[in-house]
Amino acid sequence: MDSTQLARGIVRELLELGISDVVLSPGSRNAPLSVALYEVAKKGFIDLHVRIDERGAAFFALGLAKASDNYVAVVCTSGTAAANYHPAVLEAHHAHNKLLVITADRPARLRGTGANQTTNQVNIYGDVKSHDVAAPIAIAPLLAGGPVHLNVQFDEPLLPTDTNDWLDGLEIEMAADLPELEGELHVSEGTVVIIGHDRGTFEADLIIDALLAADLPVIAEDPLSFPGAIPHAALFLADEKVREKLRPTTAVVIGRTTLSRSINALIASAEKIV
């Protein structure tokens, strides 16, 4: 399969998964993806955000993923471009954000030969799940809530030689529903709820309904992810005297708390952590 067909297959997968935002850092080796993405953007199937600087592009995509709680794809060319995505991918990994990183690569046969802009990009992001792709691949089974890396091998020629309407017969596949909260929330006096960045993959509305019924104080490590939380909690909890006065008997933690030392200190001070 040539590079044009491979790129079109990947982009079609993105559309069928319902991914609506793609951030593109254009380059030479990812030209097949750039052309395919432009074609679907022109038809209104995606919002294509072009960002030349790779580091900024990756963080922009991360922001979109956090705000939408949906997978956002970010696409770059080979070599050092892929390395410039690493800071944002690392943050997405620890916060469990939905980032689909697609890096273009030379064919595997050129690795270790000194070819221009060629390095070992497989597993370049450490513990993030990485898939070396030389043929069409089903992306849906790979998406488990955190960042995923597709390293796609493109051989020359990199530009399309046909004008086929490859978007005919497109079917949009709805994303799987997030888990629901089951049962009632029974709490005692002195209970506080702390919500991490990913909300434990639960929908915000489900958490809000449960907490309103229980009438509990709520602290969110990322205030943007939960508007009903106590504002500026991380700031006033930095005062040890305030933290001691507010020490909970039970801390109910939903999701992962990774950034705020003061909030983690409050959790650690609780008599019981759930």
Predicted regions: what they are:
Residues 45, 140-188:
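Conformationally flexible catalytic loops at phosphate/diphosphate-handling active centers
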Residues 32-108, 259:
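Thiamine diphosphate
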Residues 66, 78, 84, 195-273:
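Glycine-rich, anion-gripping cofactor-binding loops and their flanking helix/strand elements
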Residues 75-77, 98-105, 149-153, 194-196, ...:
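Short beta-strand segments
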Residues 8-19, 64-69, 139-144, 182-191, ...:
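Glycine-rich phosphate/diphosphate-binding loops that line cofactor/substrate pockets in enzymes
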Residues 70, 105-109, 113-147:
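Conserved thiamine diphosphate
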Residues 28, 106, 152-158, 197-199, ...:
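Glycine-rich beta-alpha junction loops
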Residues 23-26, 101-104, 217-222, 273-274:
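Short internal beta-strands
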